[in-house]
């Protein structure tokens, strides 16, 4: 048991975060299940699918991290994992836009319950995105430096907001990149050549919100780390 504890000790923070994310996901699904029992409707079934998609970038980020640490096939493996990660990453914060469904009250369930339900799913999805972005930023930071790491975060925030807009308003899916790449590229170039005011406002506001939220979360993480180190030094 002691040997197992020593092996797990270096990864206790990541294991704790993983356990919390799993717990948040389970609570989300339980809330959805309660709603289906109360209403007899599967109106918000898409939330379960969306939270599943939100886990994919986290898995890809862990894969990229594993290859980066082992330095094995890093030139090929990490870029491939990073590209796949970027394609699926918008699915994590995308759930925030599901809050728009609150504008259409559903009979049989109190509005406050639906508010908490969607917020719980959205919060969980956002945290999944934050953790996966933190892992990817760490890879970029170790390979290219701290400034490059933060430039990567800003670029991802902008691209993710673009992806969320495409998913919410144009109704495209991540897998369209694999099954309809040329068609989607042609359509995208058409939209990009004549951007609407709505698209400019949405992408600008969402990317600003996303980056600010990430930086705030990152700063709180540093504060907690400093406090933990301080407590450890005081106990010695």
Predicted feature descriptions by range:
Residues 116-129, 191-212:
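Hydrophobic alpha-helical transmembrane segments
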Residues 79-90, 152-170:
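Hydrophobic alpha-helical membrane-insertion segments
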Residues 127-140, 204-227:
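Transmembrane alpha-helical segments in integral membrane proteins
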Residues 8-9, 65-77, 138-148:
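Membrane-interface helix-boundary motifs at transmembrane edges
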Residues 4-21:
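N-terminal membrane topogenic signal
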């Amino acid at each position: 048991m002691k040997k197992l504890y020593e092996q797990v000790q270096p990864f206790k923070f990541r294991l704790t975060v993983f356990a919390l994310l799993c717990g948040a996901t389970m609570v989300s699904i339980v809330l959805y299940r309660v709603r289906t029992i109360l209403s007899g409707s599967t109106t918000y079934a898409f939330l379960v699918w969306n939270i599943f998609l939100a886990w994919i970038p986290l898995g890809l980020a862990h894969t990229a991290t594993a290859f980066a640490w082992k330095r094995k096939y890093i030139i090929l493996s990490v870029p491939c994992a990073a590209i796949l990660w970027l394609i699926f990453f918008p699915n994590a914060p995308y759930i925030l836009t599901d809050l728009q469904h609150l504008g259409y009250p559903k009979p049989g369930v109190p509005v406050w319950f639906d508010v908490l339900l969607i917020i719980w799913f959205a919060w969980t999805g956002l945290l999944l995105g934050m953790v996966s972005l933190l892992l990817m930023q760490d890879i970029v930071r170790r390979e290219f430096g701290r400034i490059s790491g933060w430039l990567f975060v800003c670029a991802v925030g902008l691209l993710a907001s673009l992806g969320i807009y495409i998913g919410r308003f144009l109704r495209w899916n991540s897998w369209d990149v694999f099954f309809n790449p040329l068609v989607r590229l042609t359509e995208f170039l058409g939209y990009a050549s004549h951007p609407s005011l709505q698209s400019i406002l949405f992408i600008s506001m969402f990317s600003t919100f996303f980056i600010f939220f990430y930086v705030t979360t990152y700063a709180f993480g540093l504060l907690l780390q400093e406090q933990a180190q301080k407590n450890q030094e005081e106990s010695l």
